[in-house]
Amino acid sequence: MQRLALAGTRAIVDMSYARHFLDFQGSAIPSKMQKLVVTRLSPNFREAVTLRRDCPVPLPGDGDLLVRNRFVGVNASDINYSAGRYDPSVKTPFDAGFEGVGEVVALGLSASAAFMVGQAVAYMAPGSFAEYTVVPARVAIPVPGLKPEYLTLLVSGTTAYISLKELGGLSEGKKVLVTAAAGGTGQFAVQLAKKAKCHVIGTCSSAEKSAFLKSVGCDRPINYNTEHVGTVLRQEYPQGVDVVYESVGGAMFDLAVDALATRGRLIVIGFVSGYQTPTGLSPVKAGTLPAKLLKKSASVQGFFLNHYLPEFRGAMDHLLKMYAGGELVCEVDTGGLSAEGRFTGLESVFRAVDYMYMRKNTGKIVVELPPSVNSKL
């Protein structure tokens, strides 16, 4: 048997270890796979990313899992990643995608102390837009099965949970405004604020999304295509809102600042309206911002999930328990209502990104990869 992994500096050649590197029913893991690779830095996902069909399947190291992906998540920030905005020194090519849910099909010796072949896991790690991804065991989270709902909790759910817990100061009776409230992370911000007994206002773009927001407890959905957000906030909430969960940027950010109550808090988790521009930014009225904040003793604070990774696992555990107990709706959008049908296969990731930026999705956009005939899950 060929060398499969290293345990420290020792090559593992024990034949009894071979079972960790075999798929179910004894069929070998294929030598080649498909994956999405960023080959050019650009916020235009279609221009930046290439589907490569003949890539070697990687082997896991001593502390790693090899995961056959079943569901992968699409995030607004995928185009920031493809543009190289998170690391100005990054060089192409590099693998795309942040998160996945799949099945462990191989693992290193150290990783086998906590995981086994055939186990379902969720993970947040680079390179998820692939048929197989090597995932460090330390970041993998066991889940009860291969369900897309578990994927919604990774980036989207934990962003809402940690940011509101650490920065929101939620308490009974507070008024909370959630922008893009029917999206992947907005849906969780709405529900978590309601769990804290807050009054929740949510912006969205359609009657269907308004209905969804009502179904998860939103007190006042605002369809900005039929109502002016600023007018509604001034007329119905003259004292302002206490907390804003903001992901849109631009004019929506300006409206949210104007709507803050005395000692209000605005949490910026993104500014998606600017991501497709060359700079990645959306214009805001920054010149008047200090005066507005001073006048109300208000604050604006950013939240980037990577800066809160020590809180990630605890947040996932809490959200998984909520979902298992029927306390949390995890809305999944697999493109069933899109013109070309469901998002199935890696080639559909391109359509899924377009779909998101056309503001079509309700809930988290998830791409399904074909199941293996050998899977037990």
Curated annotation (Swiss-Prot):
SUPFAM superfamilies: GroES-like, NAD(P)-binding Rossmann-fold domains
PROSITE patterns recorded: QOR_ZETA_CRYSTAL (PS01162)
Keywords: Acetylation, Lipid metabolism, NADP, Oxidoreductase, Peroxisome, Phosphoprotein
InterPro entries for this protein: ADH-like_C, ADH-like_N, GroES-like_sf, NAD(P)-bd_dom_sf, PKS_ER, Quin_OxRdtase/zeta-crystal_CS, Zn-ADH-like_protein
Modified-residue entries (Phosphoserine), positions: S299
Entry EC no(s): 1.3.1.48
Residues recorded as bearing N6-acetyllysine in the entry: K35
Location relative to the cell: Peroxisome
Enzyme class, UniProt record, top EC level: oxidoreductase
Binding site for NADP(+): T185, S205, K209, Y224, S247, I269, Y275, F303, F304, L305, N361
Stated family: Belongs to the zinc-containing alcohol dehydrogenase family. Quinone oxidoreductase subfamily.
Role this protein plays: Functions as 15-oxo-prostaglandin 13-reductase and acts on 15-keto-PGE1, 15-keto-PGE2, 15-keto-PGE1-alpha and 15-keto-PGE2-alpha with highest efficiency towards 15-keto-PGE2-alpha. Overexpression represses transcriptional activity of PPARG and inhibits adipocyte differentiation.
Name under which the protein is recorded: Prostaglandin reductase-3
Gene that produces this protein: PTGR3
